[in-house]
Design a protein with these regions (language model features):
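Bacterial Sec-exported substrate-binding components of ABC uptake systems
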Residues: 2-13, 19-69
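Conserved functional loop/turn residues at catalytic and ligand-binding sites
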Residues: 21, 78, 122
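Short, flexible loop segments at the rims of nucleotide/cofactor-binding pockets, characterized by
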Residues: 40-43, 59-60, 101-108, 124-126
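Stable alpha-helical elements in mature extracytoplasmic
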Residues: 70-73, 114, 132-136, 156-159
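A short, structured surface patch at a secondary-structure boundary
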Residues: 70-117
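Short beta-strand->loop
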Residues: 83-85, 127-130, 148-151
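Proline-aspartate-enriched helix->loop->beta-strand connector
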Residues: 122-127, 145
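Extracytoplasmic substrate-binding proteins
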Residues: 135-169
């Protein structure tokens, strides 16, 4: 019986030494070409929307929003746009969002967006609406990747999901 306990003891010790050796870290510096300090390429993703399928690079940082509904949705998602259409009843923003919109450039109204102002903001994403801006979609997508919701009426939750997807959230 003593020899059996001794053999179990030796096996346990051997196993612990073996596992410790396998788990040791190698402190050698990474190969230069193996992604050490080189920035990773941003990935592209696609968003299917009312007008097309749009490919977007990385996570957009400079967003222009072309609907009042969209402005409030972006703010709810924690995204402050660089440009937005004027609120219907605000000067230029609704009172309840005015504090969050400080520094945001007005880019026209929902029914009359200013393409030159939008282009000057150098957005990496434009979010609009087919019902309001279908006529300028081709021009907008030349400025930046552009995603349009189908309508302003109906299920706001669907538009919200589309905006979140366009923002890579």
């Amino acid at each position: 019986m003593k020899s059996f306990k001794f053999m179990v003891f030796i096996s346990v010790i051997f196993s612990l030494v073996f596992l410790a050796a396998c788990g040791s870290s190698n402190n050698a510096s990474p190969d230069v070409g193996a992604g050490g300090d080189e920035p990773q390429a941003e990935e592209y993703y696609t968003v299917e929307h009312a007008m097309d399928v749009t490919e977007i690079k990385g996570t957009p940082k400079r967003v222009v929003i072309l609907t009042n509904e969209g402005t409030e949705a972006l703010l709810a998602l924690g995204v402050k746009p660089v440009g937005a259409v004027q609120s219907w009843l605000g000067d230029p923003w609704y009172d309840h969002i005015a504090g969050e919109m400080d520094g945001v450039q007005v880019v026209g109204t929902e029914s009359a967006v200013n393409l030159e102002t939008i282009a000057s903001l150098q957005p990496d994403l434009i979010i609009g609406n087919k019902l309001r801006q279908e006529e300028v979609y081709e021009q907008l997508k030349q400025i930046a990747p552009t995603v349009f919701a189908e309508t302003l009426k109906g299920d706001w939750k669907e538009n919200f999901k589309l905006y979140a997807k366009a923002l890579n959230m």
